[in-house]
Amino acid sequence: MAEPDSTTDSARRSAIEAELRRLEESALYSGQMQFEMTKQWRGINLWLGLPASGLAAISGTVALVSATGRVAAGVIALVASGFGAVLTTVNASHRMNQAAASANSYLEIQTAARQTREVDLPYLAIDEARQVLAEITTRRDEQNKTAEPPNRRAYKKARRNIGSGGQTYAVDETTTPTGR
């Protein structure tokens, strides 16, 4: 390997910075899409869970109040169990929690990439900077393996939210990055 010089160090530092920006952007979009998936799964959980619970309560009430309401109570109970069966099969609450955990993991990766780029990179030795980049990349790759792929709707909503400044910090609007 050639001896490092200031030109080579500068080029490598710029390449590491560019890659950190890519990781940050990737984590930004992936995290926002997972937050959108969290919202969708929460909605599905409520849309299936509330009717199942309400109909079960109604069928129990109808069955207890009147002997002539047994058929109606049975039909309502069957509909409630149908909602419950779909809810159990879809497992919306687990998927909601999984999407939220993935979103937060992506936020951690985004923050680590940004802090490394903005705070640490100017002061790290090139080999140390490369090692930190590799560690953040590994974290992102591991998260990509476990995160559920987002659907088209989550992708579009995430892109719209980011485009409208939904992931912008106020401090970034009033200051400029340190020399970059």
What positions do the PLM features span?
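Conserved non-transmembrane functional hotspots
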Residues: 2-51, 65, 86-180
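Short hydrophobic alpha-helical transmembrane segments
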Residues: 47-91
